[in-house]
Amino acid sequence: MKKLTTLLLASTLLIAACGNDDSKKDDSKTSKKDDGVKAELKQATKAYDKYTDEQLNEFLKGTEKFVKAIENNDMAQAKALYPKVRMYYERSEPVAEAFGDLDPKIDARLADMKEEKKEKEWSGYHKIEKALYEDKKIDDVTKKDAQQLLKDAKELH
């Protein structure tokens, strides 16, 4: 997934940055400037790839700890981990959204699912958040949702 993410991002950035503008003549100054822009773009793409990898790695590690807390019925630990782990997902979400089917599984809100008449398909962090903070319980459904979340996080990673 990381390589695909990088490829998608790099391709998009390169296509946008390397457009062909026939109104400009290609002289040595323009060519050197284009080379500089391409080098900067390549460097920025590498930096963003590294950053995204770091965020997704932390997201997966945190999700594993979060799911373990739920499996152990440790409400306090699950609540302590929730905002930290969500932060890593939010930071990587622009890339995660490129994989359309995974982002809604991980990050959908109930209101959005109801609007699409898909509330029975609701899963992910916000469903578990509801169990922890509104329902104030960890039950078998919460544990099943946590296992699915971990599976989806691994697939995203």
Regions found by a protein language model. Give the residues of each.
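Intrinsically disordered, low-complexity, charge-biased segments
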Residues: G19-K33
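Positively charged n-region of N-terminal signal peptides that target proteins for export
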Residues: M1-L4, L8
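Mature extracytoplasmic or organellar-lumen-exposed domains after removal of signal/transit peptides
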Residues: K32-H157
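C-terminal motif of bacterial Sec signal peptides marking the signal peptidase cleavage site
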Residues: L14-A17
